[in-house]
Regions:
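Hydrophobic patch in the ABC ATPase nucleotide-binding domain
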Residues: 47, 76, 138
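Active-site neighborhood of HAD-like aspartate-dependent phosphohydrolases
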Residues: 2-56
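Short, acidic loop-to-helix structural element flanking the phosphoryl-transfer center
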Residues: 8-10, 15, 93-120, 126, ...
Length: 228
């Protein structure tokens, strides 16, 4: 009888006990929907053609970062709370209508949840996170969820990942972060965590600070769980 060697994770990841997923661009293909939601609100308030926002500069950052800069540029007669609420509601409408979960993501999450403690740490607000995690019953696999609204500073500061680690009761050096944005990669490294970056939103050259860069979810599965 021929014995089959057990599947083993990548040597640099064998110490990992917890995994933190970014949400936008990792769990859900929401970056285009974020941009559409912002554009819809800019149009509503009369700034469709002169909003002055370069969306690529905010990839991985919170909505507040966008609105802070927009208000600084234009001083519109709207509060940041009003603008944030409008954009959030529009984004929720788009996500509920289009359900843009990455196709192979749910199967990966289910497999990882059998071995690791999982968390979501997202720049989105809790109402948006809740809507996304209801899709494909993903909420069942993420007992710990942290939003940028829960911490003093959003990405690229490490606050959100450190709070997630505390909730997971896992040491930061035993956590792997899965990210798609340079700001998130920087935040994960600053938190003392291992970072796998996936090229859903940016080319590998923009994610070079990550420990490992991959192009698909099958590669993440192989790295963390091994292949038989």
């Amino acid at each position: 009888m021929t014995s089959v060697a057990p599947a083993l994770p990548h040597p640099s990841l064998r110490h990992i006990e917890g995994i933190i997923f970014d949400m936008d661009g990792v769990i859900v293909d929401s970056e285009p929907r974020h941009q559409q939601a912002f554009m819809d609100i800019f149009h509503e308030i009369g700034y469709a053609d002169n909003h002055g926002i370069q969306f690529e500069d905010y990839l991985g950052k919170s909505d507040r970062a966008v609105w802070d800069d927009f208000i600084s540029m234009h001083q519109p007669p709207y509060s940041i709370e009003d603008l944030t609420s409008r954009k959030q509601n529009r984004l929720i409408d788009l996500i509920q209508k289009e359900k843009p979960i990455f196709e192979t993501l749910p199967a990966l999450v289910e497999k990882l949840a059998r071995k690791f403690t999982l968390s979501v740490a997202s720049g989105s607000l809790h109402p948006v996170i809740d809507v996304v995690l209801k899709l494909e019953n993903l909420r069942n696999f993420f007992p710990n969820v942290v939003s940028s609204q829960d911490v003093p500073k959003g990405k690229p500061a490490p606050d959100i990942f450190l709070k997630a680690a505390n909730s997971m009761q896992v040491s930061p050096d035993k956590i792997c972060v899965i990210e798609d944005a340079a700001a998130g990669v920087q935040a994960g490294k600053s938190a003392g965590m291992t970072v796998i970056a996936i090229t859903n939103s940016l080319p590998s050259s923009a994610l070079s600070q990550a420990d490992i860069v991959v192009s698909d979810y099958e590669s993440i599965e192989s790295l963390l769980l091994g292949r038989p």
